[in-house]
Swiss-Prot record:
Binding site for Mg(2+) 3: Q820, E832
Cofactor names: Mg(2+); Mn(2+)
Gene name of this polypeptide: carB
Domain MGS-like: 930-1058
Organism: Streptococcus pneumoniae (strain Hungary19A-6)
Function: Large subunit of the glutamine-dependent carbamoyl phosphate synthetase (CPSase). CPSase catalyzes the formation of carbamoyl phosphate from the ammonia moiety of glutamine, carbonate, and phosphate donated by ATP, constituting the first step of 2 biosynthetic pathways, one leading to arginine and/or urea and the other to pyrimidine nucleotides.
Region annotation (Allosteric domain) ranges: 930-1058
Protein name, per record: Carbamoyl phosphate synthase large chain
Record's GO cellular component terms: cytoplasm
Record-listed Mg(2+) 1 binding positions: Q284, E298
List of residues binding Mn(2+) 2: E298, N300
Region (Carbamoyl phosphate synthetic domain): 547-929
Record-linked SUPFAM superfamilies: Carbamoyl phosphate synthetase, large subunit connection domain (SSF48108), Glutathione synthetase ATP-binding domain-like (SSF56059), Methylglyoxal synthase-like (SSF52335), PreATP-grasp domain (SSF52440)
UniProt KW keywords: Amino-acid biosynthesis, Arginine biosynthesis, ATP-binding, Ligase, Magnesium, Manganese, Metal-binding, Nucleotide-binding, Pyrimidine biosynthesis, Repeat
Family, similarity comment: Belongs to the CarB family.
Length: 1058
């Protein structure tokens, strides 16, 4: 059926900020879909609140609205644009929920807007637990016995009839939020109570636990002519019971018989046909390992995390085709873009194995609850491709960037057997490494399978890896064993470790004996047809399929998995850099390991290598491609850390040189550079042990900011107020050494701001200055940033511009750099300089209309700013006000404190833009899900040093009609200054303490600051946790509360009797 001509304008809803459970895969899907619709001649209107994505670039849609995804704003845009249709299946759960809300609200009917791709009834049938159950019964598809409940009592009654363990699944929440496994009534009571609160319809499903079954997923497509096919099936290494987003996944499935595969394939196709979905759909099933019994777990009637993985694993572009199907095209009339010759109506065949491993944030959250269950905790993921399971698994392990280069964490050797087995049974984020350690200790695959329900097939593979380790250890320098190890994915570093030699010597031995990888093409058809995709993976085998072109090439290193501190912003810069390389006439090659992102879409670059970002893997590609040089400044710390080893190996680093990167990152060299340039910085010293640190702090004077050198996202950074806290920090938080000193700086409480600058070596373009709302001490990635600055004097702005130019020229910066300043009493100090693209690049590019990463790349390749038409210095300001606000994922991470400080905690960002600061702030708060009603109660629990300032805020809250509550000390202070606040207990005062007020819905906002003694703050942590769990806006910085007040004041009216 040809495409529809009765619709011209289509609205696409994006997925908003990146949170755990909804990451960059939707930027990838949304970008593909918008371009796919434009390609067919439709006008595309996009709404998304996330500035950090490629999807919200002007070129992606005809009209791009970076506005909050809320009923209020989307309705406005619908009325203004009047689209003919809405495509809701590409914006994750956020997009789906928004579409449902618009539909229930009646606005779509009023404007005559129709749904494309998936009918509303199908979304309801897949998402609403009751309707889903009815549909499965009609199709005679087995589902675990379950009951829908609206109260805790109903849950307990049902569990009594089927027996424990049971699983709780709240309706309409994302990534399993609020759900969990319950072994007894106490756990059931706790989890159901929380789940009912988090479900927008106060509804939970209680179901029989089928933990221990194999978890299998099918990614299926269907069109309006009822053609349906399976793109890919996937098998979780972890059995049912761990959220699929937190599981290690292999594609294609490895342990099913042909009969089982056909059985589950038929089930999946019958479900997508019954739901009449036009587009992509994901079906999750549980298979009993001991019989042919299976259950349908759930169906996602939209593009999902798994479909991004399936697209990258097979090369079959699901989102692109889903968009074409949504407008009426059928699978047998769309050409498969991979082969360019076959149609999309065929099932991809794979002649390789793909492994996906999730990336967790627990390196940043040491206190976080690491036990895995039905609620997702990973922030990102890596994928690796190999010719066997061992190879793809080991390549994925070294892609994770958690300091491992094999399926082994050396520290685990010291763990006792009992502790080891407990971790093997009770899965944490690092279970793979514990299981591998158990095998090294002689536990058999059978014993471990019994304990974990992991299929023995995978455990045998781990045993095989261990056997190769032993072979290597027994035969140093043996070429045959070396070949075997390389065929199974071993890194040079692991081999060097077992041989007691260096990585470099292993590499030399390989090169001398021509043991080098070949590159194979991902072609969707197991080489059955000719293919034209430039998408490759390495393996040690025969016949290299990646042919070097005659054109000069440039290699761009991506940023690897998404984690806190290094998010999708760096992928954004990578993609823009590629566009500029191509425009300059070079071949652009990308190397990256993240399946969720736009940069690993094979149509973005001239060549894509899906490989780990390690020295060995990068050098292998360089040896083959011989590029003109490598660009490292867009891949975050991942790529920057590779600059030095690559340069030592004789590779040309394009842009700022390694020696200059070092001058910005190495403390002593940096201080020296600032002295030479006559730029002030807060007084500070380096320390290599506890005594040196104490001495430095006494000299500088408390408070001090302490942190390790060379980190991204403020890992292990703290503000300490006294020597006792400093000593405990040095003992527990960091492993200081002469190689890894700790920086001790005077902590200046001032206004913080940052600048991104682009330099060609002679001139410096400063697109804009961003002012932070939170004062210094909150990590820049967790601060709200305002552009253009609202409170900085002309003199301060000129000083900032002057220092920026001096630094860029003085540090020989070529390309991008980011500088953070703190201002106190009109004096400007430099806090830090990053000689690379930073996380503010997408935001600043969008609000200034300067494609910063593209400009930087053109300068790196030899053009000058004047040739590109840019002047030297600060770019003229925009007249509108733009705010970048952080978004957090605390609801997903139990035991992680939501208190803001110098260590970054946000997972994503939103943008609010309008004519005034207050309006822009309102949008930013709305977009980041911080919605404050216009009346209610606000609680203050404030540290002594901030009570004075909090008093002023409390008065202003009272003036606009809020009731003021406060904890004992704060209430007494307020009373002594003439403000009566209702006293409320902190913790443990039964039904009079803050958490119980929160549970009863009597509190609309909490303002909680923490004093200098962090130790005494367990109460505060419980208060903050209760706010997070009940969705009550929480402010741990008075500046953020002040910004919210400005919004409320601008929206409130004074009513007074005459």
């Amino acid at each position: 059926m040809p495409k529809r001509t009765d619709i011209q304008k289509i609205m696409v809803i994006g997925s908003g900020p990146i949170i755990i459970g909804q990451a960059a895969e939707f930027d990838y899907a949304g970008t593909q879909a918008c371009l796919s619709l434009k390609e067919e001649g439709y006008e595309v209107v996009l709404v998304n609140s996330n500035p950090a994505t490629i999807m919200t670039d002007k070129e992606i849609a005809d009209k791009v609205y970076i506005e909050p995804i809320t009923l209020e704003f989307v309705t406005r845009i619908l009325r203004k644009e009047r689209p003919d249709a809405l495509l809701p299946t590409l914006g994750g759960q956020t997009g789906l929920n928004m579409a449902m809300e618009l539909s229930k609200n009646g606005i779509l009917d009023e404007l005559g807007v129709e749904f494309l791709g998936t009918r509303l009834s199908a979304i309801d049938q897949a998402e609403d637990r009751d309707l889903f159950k009815q549909l499965m019964e009609e199709l005679e598809q087995p589902i675990p016995e379950s009951e829908i409940v609206n109260t805790v009592e109903e849950a307990i009654a049902f569990a009594a009839t089927i027996g424990y363990p049971v699983i709780v699944r709240p309706a309409f929440t994302l990534g399993g939020t609020g759900g969990g496994m319950c072994a007894n009534e106490k756990e059931l009571r706790e989890i159901t109570e929380n789940g009912l609160k988090l479900s927008p319809v106060t509804q939970c499903l209680i179901e029989r636990s089928i933990a221990g079954f194999k978890e299998i997923e099918y990614e299926v497509m269907r069109d309006s002519a009822d053609n349906a096919l399976v793109v890919c099936n996937m098998e979780n290494f972890d059995p049912v019971g761990i959220h699929t987003g937190d599981s290690i996944v292999f594609a294609p499935a490895q342990t099913m018989s042909d009969y089982e595969n056909q059985m589950l394939r038929d089930a999946s196709l019958s479900i997508i046909r019954a739901l009449k979905i036009e587009g992509g759909c994901n079906v999750q099933l549980a298979l009993d390992p001991n019989s042919f019994k299976y259950y349908v777990i759930e169906v996602n009637p939209r593009v999902s995390r798994s479909s991004a993985l399936a697209s990258k694993a097979t090369g079959y572009p699901i989102a692109k085709l889903a968009a074409k199907i949504a407008v009426g095209l059928t699978l047998d009339e769309v050409i498969n873009p991979v082969t360019g010759s076959t149609y999309a109506m065929f099932e991809p065949a794979l002649d390789y194995v793909v492994a996906k491993i999730p990336r967790f944030p627990f390196d940043k959250f040491e206190k976080g609850e690491r036990r895995l269950g039905t609620q997702m905790k990973a922030t990102g993921e890596v994928m690796a491709i190999g010719r066997n399971i061992e190879e793809s698994l080991l390549k994925a392990c070294r892609s994770l960037e958690i300091g491992v280069h094999h399926n082994e964490i050396p520290e685990l050797a010291a763990v006792s057997d009992d502790a080891l087995i407990e971790k093997v049974v009770k899965a944490q984020d690092d279970r793979l490494f514990y299981v591998s350690e158990a095998i090294r200790r002689g536990y058999t695959p059978e014993e471990i399978a019994e304990l974990t329900k992991i299929d023995i097939f995978y455990l045998d593979k781990l045993l095989h890896i261990f056997e190769i380790e032993q072979e290597l250890g027994a035969h140093p320098q043996d070429l045959e064993v070396l070949k075997t190890a390389k065929l199974n994915g071993f890194s040079d570093r692991k081999i060097a470790e077992l041989w007691g030699t260096t990585d470099d010597q292993v590499r030399q031995l390989r090169l001398e004996n021509k043991i080098v990888p070949v590159y194979k093409m991902v072609d969707t058809c197991a080489a059955e047809f000719d293919s034209e995709t430039p998408y490759f993976y390495s393996t040690y085998g025969w016949e290299n399929e990646s042919i070097r072109s005659d054109k000069e090439s440039v290699l761009v290193l991506g940023s690897g998995p998404i984690r806190i501190g290094q998010g999708v912003e760096f992928d954004y810069a990578t993609v823009h850099s590629v566009k500029a390389i191509q425009a300059a006439g070079y071949e652009a090659i990308i190397m990256n390991s993240n399946p969720e992102t736009v940069s690993t879409d094979f149509s973005v670059s001239d060549k894509l290598y899906f490989e780990p970002l390690t020295f060995e893997d990068v050098m292998n590609v360089i040896d083959l491609e011989q590029p003109k040089g490598v660009i490292v400044q867009f891949g975050g710390q991942t790529a920057i850390n590779l600059a030095e080893p690559l340069a030592k190996a004789g590779v040309t680093i394009l842009g700022t040189q390694v020696a200059d990167l070092d001058r910005a990152e190495d403390r002593d060299l940096f201080e020296q550079a600032l002295k030479e340039l006559d730029i002030p910085q807060p007084p500070g010293q380096t320390a290599t042990n506890e005594e040196e640190a104490a001495l430095a702090a006494r000299k500088i004077g408390f408070p001090v900011l302490v942190r390790p050198s060379y980190v991204l996202g403020g890992r292990a950074m703290e503000i300490v107020e006294n020597e006792e806290d400093l000593r405990s920090y040095m003992r527990t938080a960091v492993k200081a050494s002469p190689d890894h000193p700790v920086l001790v700086d005077s902590y200046i409480v001032g206004q913080e701001c940052e600048v991104d600058a682009i330099s060609d070596g002679k001139n410096v373009l400063i697109p804009g200055i961003m002012e932070h709302i939170e004062r210094a001490g909150v990590h820049s990635g967790d601060s709200m940033a305002v552009y253009p600055p609202q409170t900085l004097s002309q003199k301060v702005q000129e000083t900032i511009a002057d220092y920026t130019k001096r630094l860029a020229i003085g540090l020989h910066c070529l390309g991008m750099m980011n500088i953070q300043f703190v201002i106190k009493d009109e004096k400007v100090y430099v806090i830090e300089v990053n000689p690379r693209a930073s996380r503010t690049v997408p935001f600043l590019s969008k609000v200034t209309n300067i494609p910063m990463a593209q400009v930087a790349t053109k300068l790196i390749l030899g053009q000058s700013l004047s040739e590109l038409g840019y002047q030297n210095g600060l770019y003229p300001e925009s007249t509108r006000v733009h705010i970048k606000a952080p978004v957090f994922s605390f609801t997903k991470l139990a035991k992680v404190d939501s208190l803001l400080g110098p260590e970054m905690k946000s997972t994503g960002e939103v943008m609010g833009s309008d004519a005034t600061l207050e309006k822009a702030l309102y949008k930013a708060f709305e977009a980041s899900y911080l919605h404050l009603p216009t009346f209610g109660n606000v609680v203050f629990t404030i540290a002594d040093d901030a009570k004075e300032e909090a008093l002023n805020l409390a008065r202003r809250f009272q003036n606009i009609g809020y009731g003021i509550l406060a904890t004992e000390g704060t209430a007494a202070f307020f009373a002594s200054h003439g403000l009566q606040a209702q006293p409320v207990g902190k913790i443990g005062d039964d039904d009079k303490d803050i958490p119980s007020f929160v549970r009863k819905g009597r509190i609309q906002a909490i303002i909680n600051t923490v004093g200098t003694k962090r130790t005494a703050d367990e109460d505060g942590e419980q208060i903050r946790r209760s706010a997070i769990e009940h969705g009550v806006p929480l402010f741990t910085a008075l500046d953020t509360a002040n910004a919210m007040l400005k919004v409320l004041e601008s929206r409130s009216f004074v009513t007074e009797a005459i």
